[in-house]
Each structure stands twice: as C-alpha cells, then as structure tokens.
Amino acid sequence: MNNDYKWETVGRCKFYTDGTTCTDIEVMDDTKEISFIYPKIMIDREKCKKVFSSVEIMLIGRNAISIVIPNKMLPNIKHVESKSSSFINGKYLIERAGGKLLNVFGQSEDAEIDFTLFNRIGSYAFEGCRATKVSDSEDTGFIRINNNAFFGSGFMNQPFVNGIKCVGSLVVDVDETADEVIMPKTGIQYFPDKFVKCMRLP
C-alpha cells in the first residue's frame, strides 16, 4: 500500500488520497452532498461495491480534472454543480471536452434521459440506471458510444422487439437466438458487436 495515501475529511465524507488522486470514499449516513476537490477521483468499478444512496448533490471543485466512479455508487444524484472547467453543471456527470457522459446515475423508472445534453457515452455510464425512456428519440442517432455503455441498465432489461433492443434510434442489443432480426427503416445507429444470422430491413 502506498504510504503517501491517507484518509482526509471533506464535509461529511472521507477520501483516501495522496493529495492528488483519490482511490476510495466513505460517506456518513444521511449525507446529502459530496465534494470532489482533488484533481483525480479514481474509484475502481470492479473492486468498489459501495452505495451511498443519501447523496443528492455532487459538488466539483475547480481543481478536479478527472472523475471515474461507478455509476451505481451514487444512484440518487439529482444535481451536479461544477466549478471545474472540465465538467458542466446539470443532472448528469458530463465532461465538457467532447460532451462525454460519464454517469447518468440511478434515475427513476419513469425518468426520460435527455440525450441532447451529451455527444458521447462512456463505458458503464448507465449501469444501475432504471430509466427506459428517452426525451427525444431522434437525438440519439449521432452519439458516439463506448463499449458496455448500457451494461446493467433498465434499457438492457427490456424485452427484445423484432429481435432487437433500442434506445431511441440506437440499436443496443440483438437476440442471437432469433431466426430473423428486423431493423427499423430509417434513422438507426447499430451499436452491438454481435453476429446476426439473418437481418432484414423493411
């Protein structure tokens, strides 16, 4: 273990950090806000299974340049307030450069995801998100998507329709057992990297 790392308290939260990079977080019960003041927040998605469901506001300090956290860690974030030039204010965690969605957080089952707010989607950005609707399906067709962007999300839990699962105009999954897959006529973006035995365009 790196001896330069130690636990530091910021508000009602504790951060395991060397002053530059934070690799672990603890949050006191009933805490509503979390402040990211360190340049880098790097929480390993594979190792960290912590969930801080009471936190609703994320405050980002001006020195923050990189935030990597599991989407399921802070499921109930409702507002991101950023003093950093690297991130924007809003209801999702979005990098300013390139408009990349990092975390959409939990969202309710009846929430509509606003795809007009970002141009790219990072890996696992939707993991644990319960939403299954988009606010305007036409705005999903020109978005660059990283691998596993919708992994573990409500969108992926939906049943196949004509052998596919769609998020707006994005085809995000294909039924590999289907004898025939029918793609929409227009305005689609094919995302999953799967072999399809038979595909028909109406």
Language-model region placement:
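Structural signature of tandem-repeat unit edges
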Residues: 1-123, 127-147, 151-168, 172-202
